[in-house]
Amino acid sequence: MKKTALYIAFGALSLAALPSCNKFLDVQPKGTLLQEVQFSSLQGYYDAFYGVYGTMAKSDLYGQRMTNGFVDELAQMFGSTSATSTSVKTRAYNYTDVSVQAEIYSLWLGQYQVISYVNNILANLESPSFSSSHLSQLKGEALGLRAFLHFDLVRLFAEDYQRGKDSRGIPYSYDFNLKNRTVYTVAGTYENILKDLDEAERLLSDIDETVSLDLSQSTDFWSRRAVHFNKYAVYATKARVYQAMGNSAKAAEYAKKVTDHTASFKLAGRNSFESVRRFPATGELIFGLYSNSFLDDFANRFLKNVAGTDEGVQAHSRSVLDQLYAVTGAAAGAIDNRQAAFYRNVDAYQQFIRFASSSEEATAAATAQRGLTLIRLPEMYYIQAEALYSSDPTAALAALNKVRESRGLNALTSSDLPTQVDFKAELVKEYMREMPGEGQIFPALKHFNSSFLDLLGNSTIQPSSSIFVLPWPQDELTYGNK
C-alpha cells in the first residue's frame, strides 16, 4: 500500500463506516495526497493540521461525544429518560450493553485515529524535504496535541494516577499504524505524556506570546493560535497532568504560567459573562476548535423540547440545579450568572442552552461563534486553588474567588470552608457549575473521588472504579497491542 497523508477530507469520514483499522489503512480515501506531495511545502503541513483539528471537532469526538455527549452523560449532567435509550444505560454504567459498548468503541477508535494522523505529521517532520524555521514549531504543536489526546484517553480508560499508578494504563501510539502499540502502566502512560509535553514546551518557547482568535478570519496558520495547540495549551495540559498525578507544586506552577499571561488571558467581568459562556470565550479561551456544525449538532441534541423520549436530552432537575447554584454563607445576596445562562425551564425539566438557546440562534450564529472550547482560563484557577490549599489556604481561596466573583458571586471566606474537605467539595461544585458541556466534569469527579447525584436527583452515586474506569473495546486485542 502506498502511504498516504491525511488531508482535510479525513474529517468527513464516518467512524461507523470503518469496519476495521486494517481496512481503513488499506484504502486511500478520496481527497488524500501522496506523502511526497502533501508534505513538500509548509502549506501541506498546515493542511494536514487543519484535517486533524477538523476531525477532532466532529460530533464523533470533541464536537459531542467527548464533551456534551457521552462523557457528560457519564457525569449525569445530561440524558434522555426514555427507558430504551442508550443514555439510560450509559447513566446506569451498564458497560456490557451493546449500545454503550458501541459508544466506547467509537470514542476509543476515533481518538486513536486522530493520534495516528498526528503521528503521520510527526513522521514526515523527522525527514522533511525542505528547510524552514517553522518546522520545529510544527513539531511542537503536534507533540503537544498527541499528549493532549492520550491524556483524555487515560483519564477515561485507566485508574486514577494517585490510586492506581501501577495498574494498566493505555497504549501510547507513536506510529501512523494503528496496530502493535505498547501498553504502559498508568505511570508509564503519564511519563510518555509528559515527555511529549516537555519537548512541545521547548519547541514552542519562542512563539505564541499572543494567543487569540483573530476574528478577521485570517488564513495565516500562525494567527488564530487559540484554535491551535499553542504554547499556553501546553502549559494548561501540563497543569492538568500534574494535578492528576498529585504534584501540587508543578500543577500550580504551570497553571500560574497561564493566569499570569494577562496579555492574552483575563477573566470576564461580573457583568460580562455573556461574552464568555460559549466560543470564542474572548479572553478565557486557551484552546478550542472551529466547527461549522457544532451549534447545529447542539441544537439537534438539546433543543427538541420533548422530555422523556429519545427526541430530547434534558439536564439535571430544577431542584438539583438550584441546590448546585445555591448562594450561601458570606456570598449570600448575589446571583450566580451561570445558572440562567446555561439552563431554562421547559415543562417539567431543565433544558441546557449554554451554547445556543434556539435552533434559529444556532443557525444564525456568526462564523466567529462557530466553534467549541476545550481548555478555558477558569480551570487554571481551580487547579491552583486545589494545589495551593495545603501550603497556603488563603491563596487557594483567593484563586477560587477570582472565578466566583467574575461570575457575579461574592467572595467566600475561610469560615465558609473551614476544612480541606469542605474546600474540595466546593471545588467539585465549581467544576459542575462552570463546565457543563465541555466533558471535564466526569474526569473531575474521578480525580476528587467524589460522590454525585444522578440526573434526576433521585439517588447518590458512590465513586468506584467500576464507574470511573471504562472497559477497553472488545475488539482492541485484534489491533495487536502488546
Residue map of PLM features:
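Inward-facing hydrophobic residues that define packing positions of alpha-helical scaffold repeats
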Residues: 49, 115-118, 190, 197, ...
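Conserved, well-structured interaction surfaces
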Residues: 85-157, 184-187, 204, 366-372, ...
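TPR-repeat structural position
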Residues: 190, 248, 393-394
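Membrane-proximal, proline-rich intrinsically disordered regions
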Residues: 21-71, 411, 450-482
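Bacterial Sec-dependent N-terminal signal peptides
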Residues: 1-30
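Short, surface-exposed recognition loops and adjoining beta-strand edges that mediate ligand/DNA contacts
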Residues: 36, 66-79, 159-166, 210-300, ...
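Short coil/linker segments at helix-helix boundaries
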Residues: 156-192
